[in-house]
Amino acid sequence: MAGFRLTTKVQVSGWRFLLRRVEHAIVRRDTRMFDDPLQFYSRAVFAGVVVSVLICLGAALMAYFKPLGKQGSDQLLVDRTTNQLYVMLPGSNQLRPVYNLTSARLVLGNASNPVAVKSEELNRISKGQSIGIPGAPYATPTGTPASQWTLCDTVAKPDSSAPKVETSILIRTLAIDSGVGPIRADQGMLVSYEGANWLITEGGRHSIDLADRAVTSAVGIPVTAKPTPISQGLFNALPNRGPWQLPQIPAAGAPNSVGLPENLVIGSVFRTATESDPQHYVVLPDGVARVNNTTAAALRATNSYGLMQPPAVEASVVAKIPEQVYVSPLPDQPLDVLLRQDSPVLCWSWQREPGDQAPKTTVIAGRRLPLPANAIGTGIDQIGGDSTVYIEGGQFVRLQSPDPRVGESMYYIDPQGVRYGIANDDAAKNLGLAGPVNAPWQVVGLLVDGPVLSKEAALIEHDTLPADPNPRKVASGEG
C-alpha cells in the first residue's frame, strides 16, 4: 500500500500552511503570520452552515407535524382567502360561520386567536348556519385605562334667540390651561333648562328666580345677564345643591321681644362693630342670627323696614340675646358671573384614581374643550346619540349607578364610543378583559348602547343580519 502514497501528511500540512500564508498575503498584506484571525472566518462559515441545517430540519418537522393551512384540533379558524371566521362547536363536526371574533370567543369560552386555514381544507368540512351577536364589536381591544370622564356642552351663538348646544364626551386625560379650567368658588354661570333658570357654581347647580332682584343683585347677577341652555345630560350630571332663595321669617315686621331697640322689627338687619368687618345679624321671633354680607344685602333689598343703613348695636347687648340659626344658601361674597360669550364651554368632570376612597367631581368652564391640541378634531360624531366622543382606545369599566337599587354593571366601550354590556365575570374573562376601571353612569349612559355580550346571545343562529334602523349617509368628500 505504501507504493500508492504519493504525498505525506507533512506535505499536505505544508501545502495547507502555504495556502493560508497566501491568503494572509492577499487579505492582510502580511505573510509573517504572528497571529491567525482568519481562522475565525472559517469557523463562522461552519457555524452558519450548521444553524441553517438545523433551521431547515426544524421547518421540515413543523411542516410534517403541524402543516400550515390544516385544521388540526383548532376550533377557531379563519379562511386564508376570504378572512371569514369559523368556529367548531364542542361536540360538533360542523363549521359555523361567526360574525365577529367577540362572538367566537364567547362561544368557545376562551380568548384564543384564529388559526389560518386554506379554503380547500375548509370546503371539505360541512357547514351550518351563521351564529354570533349582530352589532357586537369585532374584537375587544383596550387602551390606557381612563380615570377621568368628562361631559361638556358647547354653546354656539349664545346671543341668538335659539342658541345651539353641542355635547361632547371626553374619555381621556384633560388639558387644563388659561383658556379652560375649573370654576372657582367666587365664580358662577347662568344657564336654563326646560324653562327654569339655574346658577352653576363649583359645587353644582342652584335654581334661581331671576325676577327676585333682591337675591340676584346680592349675589352679583347683573340685570343684563341672559341664561343659555344646557343639555339634559349635563343637567342630570350636575348635582342639585338646592334653590338660592331666602327662607321666610315668621312674623316678619312685628315688634321684637328680645330686648333690641324698637326700630329693629322682626326680619330687619343690624350690625355689630368689630375690629375687622362688621358682623350682620337678622332679628328672629325668638332671638337673632348671624348672616353673611350677601344674605344681609338680600334681606334688606327684600324689605329694609325703613332703615337706610343697618343700625349698629353694641356687642354687649347682642351677647345677652339668644342666638339662633338662619339657614341661608347664599355665598359669603357676590359672584363673578361668567358670560357664555366669553366661556361657551361648560363641563362636568369625574375622576377617580386607584386608591381613592371616593371620586372627585369638578365643574369646568372656558373658551374651548379641555383637550390637547393633537386631539382637536378627532372626535367621533355618533349617529344614534347626540354626542361627539373623544376616547383613547377601548375601555373596560365597572360603574355604580346613582340609583342604589340598580347595583353595579360592567361595560366594554369600544374605540368608536359604543358601550356594550358584559353579562358576567366569565364573559369578561373569555373576551380577555380584566381589571375594570370605575366610571360614572352620568357619562357612560349617554353613549350609544350596543348589544349585551354573552355566550347565550352568541349562540343564536341567523339567516341574515337585520338592517341598521338609523343609518347615515357618508359626508361628501369622504367617499
Swiss-Prot record:
Sequence ranges on the Cytoplasmic membrane side: 1-44
InterPro entries (alphabetical): T7SS_EccB, T7SS_EccB_R1, T7SS_EccB_R3
Record has Phosphoprotein as a keyword: no
Broad class of the protein's primary localization: membrane
Superkingdom of origin: Bacteria
Keywords associated with the record: ATP-binding, Cell inner membrane, Cell membrane, Disulfide bond, Hydrolase, Membrane, Nucleotide-binding, Repeat, Transmembrane, Transmembrane helix, Transport
Bilayer-spanning residue ranges: 45-65
Membrane topology summary: Single-pass membrane protein
Single GO cellular component term: plasma membrane
Cell location: Cell inner membrane
Alphabetized GO MF terms: ATP binding; hydrolase activity
Cystine bridges: C152-C347
Intervals, Periplasmic compartment: 66-479
Region (Structural repeat C1/2) residue spans: 187-243
Knockout mutant characteristics: Increases efficiency of DNA conjugation when disrupted in donor strain. Loss of secretion of EsxA and EsxB, but not their expression.
Segments for region (Structural repeat A1/1): 75-127
Miscellaneous section: DNA conjugation in M.smegmatis is unidirectional with distinct donor and recipient strains; mc(2)155 is a donor strain while MKD8 is a recipient strain. Mutations in a donor strain that alter DNA transfer do not always alter DNA transfer in a recipient strain.
Assembly and interaction partners: Part of the ESX-1 / type VII secretion system (T7SS), which is composed of cytosolic and membrane components. The ESX-1 membrane complex is composed of EccB1, EccCa1, EccCb1, EccD1 and EccE1.
Family membership noted in the UniProt record: Belongs to the EccB family.
Descriptive protein name: ESX-1 secretion system ATPase EccB1
Species per Swiss-Prot/TrEMBL record: Mycolicibacterium smegmatis (strain ATCC 700084 / mc(2)155)
